């Protein structure tokens, strides 16, 4: 059976990807920093149908993280047919008040690690003329987001990178998708310190819905998928609006209480 590598698999969308792909019969390689959490996710994935589940504890915010994962894959004799670049986090607040080291870690994890793993794994997929890559972007990638400036910029990169690579991979048998969720009910908001944003509750989707839509969109050869009809309509509307107006609206939604 085909094997899927899922980054950021210890919680949130990554955990749900593990469970849903296990239910489809995929063998799994799960990676994240928290090995204990990965072991628990792996146990449930086996119950849901995955015959083989490997756990690799690694920190992809370090530049040597992707290479370490590749070495471990080689040691265990594992071939990756399906890559889910899900690992990432966001920060929120005024940029000039945020710790620089944390902002750089965000860029390394959300961008550099994704590019590295894609570059390291896609040649073998092209050679086999078969493979699937899902890069988890965000609706934040369609416009700048004040108070989440770095995060939105990283997701804009993921979106553009995926679309560009999709053009290069035409005819190779390799499918690549940018999955663009809006707000999702996961621990992301607490990690980003953004639990008190004024985002209306009706735009939030559950992780199971987002992942199911992403898997289906990738299977159908889609290049970009925006999860949720409200998020889709919002993203399309923003294309027609003046950028300064979009910026002002985003500023009001994401502005921390201290800066209100």
Stretches with model-predicted labels:
Residues 138:
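Residue(s) in the substrate-gating loop at a strand-loop-helix junction
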């Amino acid at each position: 059976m085909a094997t899927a590598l899922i980054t950021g698999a210890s919680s949130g969308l990554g955990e749900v990807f593990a469970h849903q792909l296990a239910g489809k019969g995929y063998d799994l390689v799960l990676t994240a920093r928290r090995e204990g959490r990965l072991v628990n996710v792996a146990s449930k994935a086996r119950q849901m149908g995955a015959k083989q589940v490997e756990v690799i504890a690694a920190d992809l915010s370090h530049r040597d993280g992707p290479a370490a994962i590749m070495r471990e894959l080689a040691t265990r004799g594992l071939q990756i047919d399906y890559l889910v670049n899900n690992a990432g986090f966001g920060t929120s607040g005024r940029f000039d008040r945020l710790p620089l080291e944390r902002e750089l870690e965000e860029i390394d994890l959300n961008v550099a690690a994704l590019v590295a793993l894609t570059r390291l794994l896609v040649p073998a997929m092209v050679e086999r003329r078969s493979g699937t890559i899902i890069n988890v972007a965000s609706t934040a990638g369609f416009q700048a987001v004040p108070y989440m400036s770095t995060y939105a910029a990283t997701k804009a990169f993921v979106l553009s990178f995926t679309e560009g690579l999709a053009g290069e991979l035409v005819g190779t048998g390799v499918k690549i998708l940018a999955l663009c969720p809006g707000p999702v009910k996961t621990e992301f908001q607490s990690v980003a310190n953004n639990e008190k944003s004024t985002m209306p509750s009706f735009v939030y989707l559950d992780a199971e819905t987002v992942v199911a839509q992403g898997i289906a969109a990738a299977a159908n050869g889609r290049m970009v998928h925006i999860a949720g009809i409200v998020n889709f309509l919002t993203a399309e509307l923003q294309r027609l609006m003046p950028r300064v107006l979009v910026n002002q609206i985003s500023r009001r939604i994401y502005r921390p209480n201290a800066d209100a």
